[in-house]
């Protein structure tokens, strides 16, 4: 096999070197069908059904199309590329001319990828990092609170109570049942946080990013 051509199905042309030879849509289907089954004898009826779908064609349509394809191949070879089998059909000869079939799928995929990139711009890495960090901080915060509450239950001799400081909007959790000078006496004035205090004097303040002992 010494020659190679490109069958462009999208443009209905047979490309030989720098030259382009126009084919009809039916001739493109015909050449593709014969080439993909190279070496097989395909009957007239099968070729007509496959390459002229849903159409009533004249008896001369198939031989005329075969002749046109042969004329194009004679630009590069004198060998018989498509052989006629009388009263049987036609066969594309193996090891004659290599055909690369271009159905335009590569171009379509390229356009599709470009459209996807245009419609869905990349999310900034920095923004993604901040979102992940925020999620981890919240998870860490919740885990710490649960651990501290469990510790209160384990070591506290009194019942645990909780209430909201109306001045700071902070949640106070404590097992100190005797509250001198008001329920928030001795506690730091920290807004929008969660404050834990036990009867040993331990005070832990948690916000959405960290927990720290006072």
Curated annotation (Swiss-Prot):
<dbReference type="InterPro" id="IPR036388">
    <property type="entry name" value="WH-like_DNA-bd_sf"/>
</dbReference>
<feature type="DNA-binding region" description="OmpR/PhoB-type">
    <location>
        <begin position="1"/>
        <end position="94"/>
    </location>
</feature>
<dbReference type="InterPro" id="IPR001867">
    <property type="entry name" value="OmpR/PhoB-type_DNA-bd"/>
</dbReference>
<keyword id="KW-0732">Signal</keyword>
<dbReference type="InterPro" id="IPR016032">
    <property type="entry name" value="Sig_transdc_resp-reg_C-effctor"/>
</dbReference>
<keyword id="KW-0238">DNA-binding</keyword>
<dbReference type="GO" id="GO:0003677">
    <property type="term" value="F:DNA binding"/>
</dbReference>
<dbReference type="GO" id="GO:0000160">
    <property type="term" value="P:phosphorelay signal transduction system"/>
</dbReference>
<comment type="function">
    <text>Required for expression of pH 6 antigen.</text>
</comment>
<protein>
    <recommendedName>
        <fullName>Protein PsaE</fullName>
    </recommendedName>
</protein>
<keyword id="KW-0805">Transcription regulation</keyword>
<keyword id="KW-0804">Transcription</keyword>
<feature type="signal peptide">
    <location>
        <begin position="1"/>
        <end position="24"/>
    </location>
</feature>
<dbReference type="GO" id="GO:0006355">
    <property type="term" value="P:regulation of DNA-templated transcription"/>
</dbReference>
<dbReference type="Pfam" id="PF00486">
    <property type="entry name" value="Trans_reg_C"/>
</dbReference>
């Amino acid at each position: 096999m010494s020659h190679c051509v490109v069958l462009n199905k999208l443009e209905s042309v047979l490309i030989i070197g720098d030259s382009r030879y126009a084919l009809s849509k039916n001739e493109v289907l015909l050449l593709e069908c014969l080439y993909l089954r190279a070496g097989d004898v395909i009957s007239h009826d099968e070729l007509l059904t496959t390459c002229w779908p849903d159409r009533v064609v004249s008896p001369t349509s198939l031989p005329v199309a075969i002749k046109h394809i042969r004329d194009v191949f004679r630009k590069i070879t004198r060998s018989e590329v498509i052989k006629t089998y009388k009263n049987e059909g036609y066969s594309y000869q193996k090891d004659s001319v290599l055909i690369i079939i271009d159905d335009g799928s590569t171009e379509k995929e390229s356009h599709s990828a470009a459209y996807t990139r245009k419609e869905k711009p990349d999310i900034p890495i920095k923004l993604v990092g901040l979102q992940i960090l925020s999620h981890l901080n919240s998870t860490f915060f919740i885990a710490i609170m649960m651990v501290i509450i469990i510790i209160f239950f384990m070591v506290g001799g009194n019942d645990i109570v909780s209430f909201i400081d109306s001045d700071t909007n902070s949640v106070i959790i404590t097992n100190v049942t005797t509250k001198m000078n008001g329920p928030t006496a001795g506690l730091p004035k920290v807004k929008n946080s969660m404050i834990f205090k036990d009867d040993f004097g331990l005070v832990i303040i948690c916000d959405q990013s960290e927990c720290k002992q006072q």
